[in-house]
């Protein structure tokens, strides 16, 4: 029950109501979001000491609006009024101090002492999400502004209990929705053929890093993951033998402390070539085939994908998890499990299907290839005869030409017309040709020359490899040289010989089984000449590329070197007598210029 009003209050109430009616637009502006849907534009009302709750019920009943009134709303009203329903309601609220709020269905009215405040924690949701949700639902009211803290994800709302409860419920739903959207799961994708983790292979004296599936996915999706450790690699023809126990040496004095970048070391070479300087002063190593272009420093392994290596080394790149750069909050986490050769991905559930589809397309079974290599040495004169014999075979004829000294050779195979279709890039004066079935005919002719001691097959290695995986065939000699320093001595190994590297790639969709061969040949010899007691290495390098069909061969010729031979014939016993022993010896020195040929034949073992 509302308390009885005094006589003075009853007399002042109509005057105060009229005064507040004129000041209402300036004191209490209302927003469209809280606008009550009144049915008439004018409201006429006469009251004589009538209870305020009854007046409010009469107002809502005349406009067909459901109303809830708190018992804390008290007072009486007297007077005659003719104004709009909204202005009449605002006038009463300003006069008697109650607060009202329309939630879209019910007009709710509370007493002045019932207002409250609430602090809303949004969790992972942003304050913009709550602000947009209130605007879409038309629940934002400038009479009860919500204060936001974007950094802390917190909002504070003050107003009538119903409004505060409504905003709190909406904030809770927004926070739960954001938590569900940010929920992640972990899935394991088992690989069958591809490598999950980065792996390092040693090619040509270098540690070449091959990115795995995890690195590929991280580079595409900007994901987080563990960086790959750098593995140093020495040069191609010489390397430093690590001391037992991991102790450091000081062979080159100040160079070991990073001060000898410009000093000369063994054989007049910079000391940094022997690992004595910092990584920034070392000789850069070259990437794998085709063997040209800039590469990483020797302090880190070369990579067949320079873009990925750069991304792992650059600290400003968000892909590098070890660089300290901040990543996007929704960035996935991709890791490799080398033990099971699997990929572990933590991300949102709706993205997992796209990962599975991409991994399935990349994890395809590579073809198994076989590379047959034949290294042939032919005397210079015999090489010219050989060139006359096999050079003039064509597609439709089988005519053997020569100088008449060689016998007639049979050839039953059909000659391939694609013998000149190879796209080759020979170096210098080296002859590079693609042979069809005539490759077997060439071997027949070489066998004939071998019987006359004019040619010999040095080696015929065969190696199996996978598609797009480099095959390496090395036949080298090593010599270890001891180099004394100020306080210790180091061993350096010098290597020389034949290194044949072939990278085969099957052309997809080729009807003839066409393959691309990237070939790099390094041929070196430890010469008889020495510098400071260290043998001089003479080396040559050939780099070429060619497209070869199934059954064809790639011939690389024109590489010559001089071979010296010394024969000694002596009578046992007498030839060892001092002074007169030379009368019973016979020495014969001969020099021969040899031509070296490389014949490569690729085969597809399993498609």
Swiss-Prot record:
Tell me where in or outside the cell this protein is found: Cell outer membrane
> Where does the record place Low complexity bias?
291-306
Instruction: Provide the disulphide bond pattern.
Output: none
Q: Could you confirm whether the keyword Transmembrane helix appears in this record?
A: no
Q: Which organism is it from?
A: Xanthomonas euvesicatoria
Q: What is this protein called?
A: Type 3 secretion system secretin
The UniProt entry, under Pfam families, shows:
Secretin, Secretin_N, T3S_SPI-1_N0
Biological process GO terms, please?
protein secretion by the type III secretion system; symbiont-mediated perturbation of host programmed cell death
Organism domain of life: Bacteria
UniProt keywords (A-Z) are: Cell outer membrane, Hypersensitive response elicitation, Membrane, Protein transport, Signal, Translocation, Transport, Virulence
The positions making up the signal sequence are 1-33
PANTHER family registered for this protein in UniProt: PROBABLE GENERAL SECRETION PATHWAY PROTEIN D, SPI-1 TYPE 3 SECRETION SYSTEM SECRETIN
The annotated subunit structure for this chain is:
The core secretion machinery of the T3SS is composed of approximately 20 different proteins, including cytoplasmic components, a base, an export apparatus and a needle. This subunit is part of the base, which anchors the injectisome in the bacterial cell envelope. Forms a stable homooligomeric complex.
Q: Name the GO cellular-component terms.
A: cell outer membrane; type II protein secretion system complex; type III protein secretion system complex
Q: Which family does it belong to?
A: Belongs to the bacterial secretin family. T3SS SctC subfamily.
